[in-house]
Amino acid sequence: VTGSNGKTTVKEWLYQLLQPDYNTVRSPRSYNSQIGVPLSVWQIGSKTEMAIFEAGISQPDEMIHLEEIIKPTLGLITNIGEAHQEGFQTIQQKCIEKLTLLKACDCIIYDGDNELICECVEKLCFGCREIAWSRKDRDKPLYISKIIKGNDSTKIEYTYLQYHSYI
């Protein structure tokens, strides 16, 4: 999991969804740096079925090192914003650097409503399965039609490749 914001929240949410059915490890807290990622990877044991790691950067050429350690097969980018922008010349440069984590993934998941991310994904031509989610475009593979917030839960209604469901 990478992005400017929301990495830890998404990682924890995925862990809560996957952990009951799979032997899953995750990076502790916000261990997403050159030091934190190797410490996180050490948790993988012989019985681990899934591992969820977050990767964060603050300057160019950092993500390739994290990609070599994590070697993700499925990647997710949350968003691109101004956080840690001082190390980059442009926000596009930062987006491309973050997407370096996903270069060898079998599948990448990203915000299909974010023009910058879409442009960078297209520019990099990953050649893997892409799942773009959207709250605006019903033609995206994953269309989120409704979010209902309750007192103790949130229900998300979605359509994935013509299959309608909710979580």
Language model features with spans:
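Adenine nucleotide phosphate-binding catalytic loops in nucleotide-utilizing enzymes
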Residues: 92, 127-167
